[in-house]
Amino acid sequence: LKILYRNRLIKTNINDFLDKIETEDTPKDYLSVEELYKLAETPCKKPILKTAALFSCLTSLRISDILSLQWHEIIDFAAGGKCVHTITQKTKTEDIIPISDEALQLIGYSPEKTGLVFKGLKRSWTQQPMKEWIREAGITKNITFHSYRRTYATLQGAAGTDIRTIQSNMAHKSITTTQRYMKVVDSNKREASNRISLIRK
C-alpha cells in the first residue's frame, strides 16, 4: 500500500488509517542446564552431530558457521586461550568468538589439524537424526539447531554474564536481538566462555 501511494497509484495512504497490529514474542525452546547434561550424556547415532550440537551450546555458533568452520580459524585469543576468528555466514561480518577449554577438548583441538572441524556433518542430520537423539535423551521440547544458540544466551544470562558480553560473544549487531534471546572487554568475554559446561559439578 505504501508503494502504491508513493507511486501515486492511489490517492490516500491507507496505512494511516489502519490500527497497528500488536505482536507477541513467541516463546522459543532452549535447553535447561539439566537437559544440557542429559544431552551430553546421551549417545547419538551420528557422533559428529552430537559434537557439533554441544559445541554450539558452548560457543553460540550457528549451524552455517559450524558447517564451514576450519581448524585454522581457531586462533590465540588476546585475553588468553583460544577463539574462533571467522566470517559469520549469515551477516558476512568478521567476528572473534572466544571458546572455552572444554569446547576445545570436545572437538579434539590440535594446532596441527587442517580442513573442516566438523568434516562429514550434513545439515540434513539436524532434522530426523537430531530429533531421535533428543528424544532418546528424554527431552520433549521442540529443539532445533538454533535452539542451541538460544541455550547459550539463556544459560549465560542465568549465570550472571553481562548482556553486552553475551551480545558480543554472539556477534549481534543490536542488543535488542540479544534481549530477544534471553564491544565488551576481552577479559569479560574470556571469562564468559567458561560459564557453560557439559560436566556436572
Where are these regions (language model features)?
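Short, polar N-cap/turn motifs at the start of nucleic acid-interacting alpha helices
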Residues: E73-G80, T140-N142, T161-R180, E191
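Active-site/catalytic core of tyrosine-dependent DNA strand-transfer enzymes
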Residues: P98-T140
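Conserved tyrosine-mediated DNA breakage-rejoining catalytic core shared by Y-recombinases
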Residues: D19-T23, D29-E35, T59, S68-I107
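Catalytic-site neighborhood detector that most strongly recognizes the C-terminal catalytic loop/helix
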Residues: Y30, T88-K92, M170-R195
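N-terminal core-binding DNA-recognition domain of tyrosine site-specific recombinases/integrases
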Residues: K2, L9, D25, P47, ...
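DNA/chromatin major-groove-contacting recognition/catalytic segments
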Residues: K38, D95-P98, A159, K183-K201
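Basic, Lys/Arg- and aromatic-enriched nucleic-acid-binding interface segment
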Residues: R6, I10-I63, L67, I199
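C-terminal catalytic core of tyrosine-transesterase DNA break-rejoin enzymes
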Residues: R6, L54, L58, D65, ...
